[in-house]
Amino acid sequence: MTSVAGPHKRLEGKVAIITGGASGIGACTAELFHENGAKVVIADIQDDLGQALATKLGGKACYIHCDVSKEDEVINLVDTTVAKYGRLDIMFNNAGIIEGQGLPVSVVESEKSDLDRLLSVNLGGAFLGAKHATRVMVQQRKGCILFTSSVCTSIAGLSGHAYAASKSGVCGLAKNLTPELGKYGIRVNCISPYGLVTGVSNVSGEGEANREFVEAMLSELGTLSGQTLRADGIAKAALFLASDEAYYVSGINMVVDGGYSVVNPRLVDSINSKL
């Protein structure tokens, strides 16, 4: 009898760290990477969720507590991963926080403390993750560093100023790392999602009804009719960028927004009203 080959595992044999991996985009990506053959290290401060996910995924996954704003914890994360698995192929700097409810706030009502907090986690955490992953990947002469940014890097007025500043900084960091790390065979890319409901999105409130309401609102505001962006859409983008299929893709900001950022809705509405 001829055996039938199983589905192609796009990350077979690779080792991946996913920060913010206990919930939302991170958890969805951890599951997808695991399904595709990767050994997955889930890094987060949500210990119960992170450990539960690692247990669910089984032997090729583990959980490590890590506050990405603290360099000693990021060093421990990377060093423990390499000690356990012998290498590091993919560093997905996904951990992030929002300000307030994630909605636009007047600059005069914004607090410096919020800016400091968001820069420390969103941008500082991305910087530290890239820095210490690079230590390992340079020796391997190969690797992939990914960042989660936001569609607010492409279109203004969608978020608070501190959040927009932190996520724009992430895109700038990724772009600036690209030529330096390219010399060592390391690819660097950003993923910038349109609005979606995740564990970090306080706008969803509590309960499935609120989640469905916000998803419906985001879908209606979006440009791509009949589709709703969920965490799996970002996980699939990360899978492509982390896989060998993207072997020559580096330095991009992959905006996953259904075309939202290329449209001027006010202009479109004005034209349509006159037709």
Swiss-Prot record:
GO terms for molecular function: oxidoreductase activity. Its EC number is 1.1.1.-. Keywords: Oxidoreductase. The active site is at residue 163. Coiled coil: none annotated. Has no tropinone reductase activity. This is Tropinone reductase-like 2. It comes from Erythroxylum coca (Coca plant).
